[in-house]
Every structure is written in C-alpha cells, then in structure tokens.
C-alpha cells in the first residue's frame, strides 16, 4: 500500500531482491527510525510508479530518496509496476537489473548479459548476511512464560517485539548457533525465523531441528 514500504525495505527476507511496489504513490509518509524492521535496508533495488520526493506525515524524519541514496540502494520511478507484477505472476520470480549512472548508457545487449550473469536465488544461502553475530536478549513483558531460543535467519524487529509481549524472554541467536548454544539457554521453545534466500540451502538448520 501507500504505507508500509519502510517495513518492506528493512525486512531481511528481501535481501538480494528487487522489490516492485504495486501501489502508485510511494514515499508519502517518509522514513523514521521507529518503523524499521532491522538495522538497514536489505533490498537490492526498489521500483515504484510515482515517488513522493517531499513527504507529508507528522512521523516522518527523512525523505525516502535520501535514505535510499545514503545506503546505496538503486531505485527507479515512472515505471508501470502493475504490468511488471502481472508478468511476475505469470512467469514467476526472475533475475532483473536496474541500471543507473554510466551503466544506464550501456548497450541493452550488454545490460541483458549482466543480468543473465547474476546469481539465481535457487540454492542461495543469505542467512549469514542478515543474521546477528552475537546473541541478544529482549526481556519478556507481562506474564513471563520463560526463555525462547530464536534462530535468526532474518528475523524482523516486530516479530521479536511481539514474542516478548507474549511473555517470552527472547534470546536471538546467530544462524551459526549449535544445539549446545540452544540448550545452554534452557528454553521453553525454539523458534526459527523466516529469512531470505533458498530454504533448501539451510540443511544445517534443519538438522539441528
């Protein structure tokens, strides 16, 4: 929709992907620190129909284009995003490219070759890119249930927050965690987060489970 794009951009599940928004106007509410789902933007590219360069919202801290530029995320506007969505619906996920600067002047055949040479998502493991490197704990709120071991394969901050609100002391462990690391917490349950890449590349995590 017109809002929620900040949560999408900072969702680790979209690492390595170009995201296409179907709502026509994006950027109206700007960007703020409260709605971020992780420590940075993870998408590789951002495609919108119409970009609002000047936000109008009392919670806005910075314009969307400024944050994209600061983090080196390429974006494109003035695109028929719904036509792209219809194509993706029929053909499925595919490799793509957004070219800017000098790369935008390359011959289309060269641009296509660069896209075709890019990595496919099949067999790709991106969990090590997005996971925490050290364990962190989010204390329980309300009636305490006990410790919950969360294997961070690309978890969103809102998920951690909601688990804590339901009474768990949320221990967010790196994706490299072993069974010994999990057992040391003496958890009442183990939670595997969602994340980016191909689930088939997570055999090690499945083996622990």
Place the predicted regions along the sequence by residue:
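RNA-binding accessory domains that recognize and position tRNA/RNA substrates
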Residues: 1-180, 184-185, 199
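Cysteine-nucleophile active-site neighborhood
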Residues: 184-209
């Amino acid at each position: 929709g017109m809002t929620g794009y900040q949560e999408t951009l900072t969702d680790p599940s979209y690492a390595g992907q170009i995201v296409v928004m179907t709502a026509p106007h994006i950027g109206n509410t700007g960007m703020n620190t409260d709605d971020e789902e992780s420590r940075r933007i993870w998408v590789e590219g951002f495609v919108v129909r119409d970009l609002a360069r000047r936000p109008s919202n009392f919670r806005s801290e910075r314009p969307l284009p400024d944050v994209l530029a600061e983090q080196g995320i390429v974006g494109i506007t003035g695109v028929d995003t719904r036509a792209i969505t219809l194509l993706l619906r029929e053909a499925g996920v595919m490799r793509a490219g957004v070219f800017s600067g000098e790369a935008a002047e390359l011959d289309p055949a060269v641009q296509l070759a660069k896209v075709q040479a890019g990595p496919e998502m099949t067999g790709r493991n991106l969990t090590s890119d997005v996971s925490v490197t050290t364990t962190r704990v989010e204390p329980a709120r309300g009636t305490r249930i006990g410790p919950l071991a969360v294997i961070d394969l690309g978890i969103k901050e809102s998920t951690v927050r909601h688990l804590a609100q339901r009474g768990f002391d949320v221990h967010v462990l790196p994706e490299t965690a072993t069974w010994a690391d999990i057992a040391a917490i003496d958890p009442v349950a183990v939670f595997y987060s969602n994340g980016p890449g191909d689930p088939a590349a997570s055999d090690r995590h499945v083996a622990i489970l």
